[in-house]
Amino acid sequence: MTESLVGERRAPQFRARLSGPAGPPSVRVGMAVVWLSVIVLLPLAAIVWQAAGGGWRAFWLAVSSHAAMESFRVTLTISTAVTVINLVFGLLIAWVLVRDDFAGKRIVDAIIDLPFALPTIVAGLVMLALYGNNSPVGLHFQHTATGVGVALAFVTLPFVVRAVQPVLLEIDRETEEAAASLGANGAKIFTSVVLPSLTPALLSGAGLAFSRAIGEFGSVVLIGGAVPGKTEVSSQWIRTLIENDDRTGAAAISVVLLSISFIVLLILRVVGARAAKREEMAA
């Protein structure tokens, strides 16, 4: 009987813990939906509404103009190249931070997050000071696609590192040791044991990095210089349209960038989920 009374006393406490600080699940879901709508969905709906304000013909003329198409080409080309490069070096940095011990490791780990905290216009100023016409290191990337690429690499690198790092920490080292005991070399162990486990994280980091890159403005505006067909990315073309009081055209370009980001993220998420499922079945 005593145990029954204790159980009755504990039951409300257990239910309280399940309900959480924001009340029952229905309340939490409602709060989440409202906040998501206010912060994300309504602004997206507003930009789509503005883009459609001039009709389909005006939308098509805005996104298919020569200047717009050139900005898309420059943006997608450089962003894709930067994403691939950051996949390689982001994985390398994450590996070093997880698997290797060296002096200053914590400092390096903290520096990785610096592009998150640094205002992007400050990042652009840093790029200009280091790689501009008066470069102290003799590298002159101002008004070049290389300069835009370096700036984008700077602001997108953390997405890959931080996506891969926690997964790498959770990988079972015993599986790697077992493969080594069977005669597998380092490259074979990495490609057959480690890489499959990292694939979902790599795809997630790549998607976030690419999406950030195609919409970046502050870090490229100074070093790139908005040279049409060479360094003018879509975000800079949007600014030009706004300065010319063509907000409908600017909204149309924005919708295209948003659509590209959404499609890329969706595809990579589906591929990553399938890769994770195959990894679970293989295990």
Locate predicted features.
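C-terminal transmembrane helix and the adjacent membrane-cytosol boundary/short C-terminal tail
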Residues: 3-5, 9-12, 27-31, 104, ...
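Membrane-interfacial helix termini and adjacent extracytoplasmic/periplasmic loops
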Residues: 11-20, 56-64, 69, 99, ...
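Periplasmic/extracellular loop-to-transmembrane helix junction in inner-membrane transport proteins
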Residues: 12-26, 47-84, 96-100, 240-248
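Transmembrane-helix boundary motif in ABC transporter permease subunits
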Residues: 20, 57-59, 81-112, 125, ...
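Transmembrane alpha-helices
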Residues: 30-35, 84, 114, 118, ...
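Hydrophobic alpha-helical transmembrane segments of multipass integral membrane proteins
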Residues: 38, 73, 77-89, 93, ...
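Interhelical loop and adjacent transmembrane-helix boundary motif
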Residues: 64-66, 220-267
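Short hydrophobic faces within alpha-helices
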Residues: 72, 97, 114, 174-182, ...
